[in-house]
Every structure is written in structure tokens, then in C-alpha cells.
Curated annotation (Swiss-Prot):
Subcellular location: Cytoplasm
Function: Required for maturation of 30S ribosomal subunits.
GO CC annotation terms, alphabetical: cytosol
CDD domains: YlxS_C
Keyword entries, A-Z: Cytoplasm, Ribosome biogenesis
Pfam families per UniProt: DUF150_C (PF17384), RimP_N (PF02576)
Main location class: cytoplasm
Protein name: Ribosome maturation factor RimP
SUPFAM superfamilies assigned to the protein according to its UniProt record, in alphabetical order: YhbC-like, C-terminal domain, YhbC-like, N-terminal domain
GO biological process: ribosomal small subunit assembly; translation
InterPro entries assigned to the protein according to its UniProt record, in alphabetical order: Ribosome_maturation_RimP (IPR003728), RimP_C (IPR028998), RimP_C_sf (IPR036847), RimP_N (IPR028989), RimP_N_sf (IPR035956)
Record-stated family: Belongs to the RimP family.
């Protein structure tokens, strides 16, 4: 996770949790005047549009006071969705048995992209099976990770 996302997570997590939601993670996509701050939230009973609106108001208020982003951006608050982003070790633990797509910050075995089944996750390492071969990936080296939805 980049420094800005880490700072934003620390800043926003208490406010999101105060509303009864889990802050799954944050993405800041820089795109000139059209930068986007994505805030992913979850709840054991699911997420509604009203939940997203409530969290958006809370997050906006915090960001207005703290002003951590110097450029213009649009704020998006949503549930993680079927292709759930994976930000923390906890998310990989919850994804054991599922297929995930990950991109590493630093290449391993001359590759950065892995798509496979999560076998285990412990002590900061994710074990992923890709085409019958196992890889041990450090969570700290994962730049981006998502669950790959399967339709049976």
C-alpha cells in the first residue's frame, strides 16, 4: 500500500468504524484533474446505497478538515463487490480456497502477475497455487490484489 493510502486509512478508519462499518481499503488513482479516491466498506449484513452515502458524508467531513490531498479528486464509496480488492493479510486469510489475481511491487521469479488459488496465508506470506506450482508471496510486496469471481 502506498504512503498516501496508508495515511488516509489511518485517518478515515476510526470514522468509518464509528458508523459500524469495516474500512476494507482505499485506492487513490491519480489521473490529472480526474483523480479518484475509492473507499471500500463492508458490513456483515452487506452494504446499501444509503450506507455508502452515510460513509461518504463522514469521510468528506474528515477530509475537509484534514485536507490530506492537494489535488482535485472525486470521492467514491462502495462495497468491495464480487471482485473484492485485497488490501490486508486478513483479506488473504479470508480468501483461502478462492482464486485471486495479484500484482507484485517487485518481481519474483521474473514475474509480477499471479493468478491462482490461495492455499494459505500466515506470517505475512500468501501461498498461491498457479498452474500446479506453489508460490510464496509476501503480503508487503503485493501492490494490488483482487478475488477473481467464479460462476458455477
Amino acid at each position: 500500500m502506498a504512503k498516501l493510502e496508508e495515511k488516509l486509512t489511518e485517518m478515515l478508519e476510526p470514522g468509518v468504524e464509528a458508523l459500524g462499518f469495516e474500512l476494507v481499503g482505499i485506492e487513490f488513482v491519480r489521473a490529472g484533474k480526474h483523480s479518484i479516491l475509492r473507499v471500500f466498506i463492508d458490513h456483515e449484513n452487506g452494504i446499501t446505497v444509503d450506507d455508502c452515502a452515510d460513509v461518504s458524508h463522514q469521510v468528506s467531513a474528515i477530509l475537509d478538515v484534514e485536507d490530506p490531498i492537494s489535488t482535485e479528486y472525486n470521492l467514491e464509496v462502495s462495497s468491495p463487490g464480487m471482485d473484492r480488492p485485497l488490501f490486508k493479510e486478513k483479506h488473504y486469510i479470508e480468501s483461502v480456497g478462492e482464486v485471486v489475481q495479484v500484482r507484485l511491487s517487485m518481481p519474483m521469479d521474473d514475474r509480477r502477475n499471479f493468478k491462482g488459488k490461495v492455499l494459505a496465508c500466515e506470517n505475512g506470506m500468501v501461498s498461491i497455487e498457479v498452474d500446479g506450482q506453489q508460490f510464496q508471496l509476501a503480503v508487503a510486496n503485493i501492490e494490488k490484489g483482487n478475488v477473481v469471481p467464479t460462476f458455477d
